[in-house]
A protein has these predicted regions:
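Short, solvent-exposed loop/turn segments at the edges of secondary structure
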Residues: 56, 85-87
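Core segments of cupin and vicinal oxygen chelate
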Residues: 8-66
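A generic structural signal for ordered alpha-helices
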Residues: 11, 39, 78-81, 85
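Vicinal oxygen chelate
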Residues: 2, 22, 31-34, 60, ...
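A structural signal for short, well-ordered beta-strand segments
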Residues: 6-8, 88-90
């Protein structure tokens, strides 16, 4: 069954926020909190401070009725700045690639692709 999840972007306090949500919803993270230091360094990526390396790359927490909230730290040192409009994302988790392509094409018409649909983890894309 297709699902919708919510992605929240923070500027350095994702782990604190998600530990709070975890206590409110009395639930556990889907997987351990993933830190930037746990990911391979991408070619051309800026050198990060120890503080930035300890930032959250990804966290996922089930809340109500199967809804999952996910989050990340958006770091200015990596060229990201949290502003109204990029601090929340709605994710469509489709059952099939065909459904993902159909919805992505329809939603992206007239928008700006942040990340074209690709097969990074199943299939992924982002539209603004």
């Amino acid at each position: 069954m297709s699902k919708v999840s919510i992605y929240l972007n923070f500027q350095g306090n994702t782990e604190e926020a998600f530990n709070f949500y975890k206590s409110v919803f009395n639930t556990e993270f889907v997987t351990p909190v993933m830190k930037l230091k746990d990911a391979p360094l991408q070619p051309g990526a800026p050198q990060l401070s120890e503080k930035d390396l300890n930032s959250v790359m990804h966290v996922a927490l089930p809340i109500l009725g199967g809804t999952v909230i996910m989050g990340t730290d958006m770091l200015e040192s990596m060229g990201h700045k949290v502003v109204v409009g990029n601090n929340t994302t709605i994710n469509l988790e489709c059952d099939t690639r065909e459904e993902a392509h159909k919805l992505f094409s329809a939603i992206s018409a007239g928008g700006s692709d942040i990340a074209p649909l690709s097969s990074s983890s199943g299939v992924f894309g982002a539209v603004a």
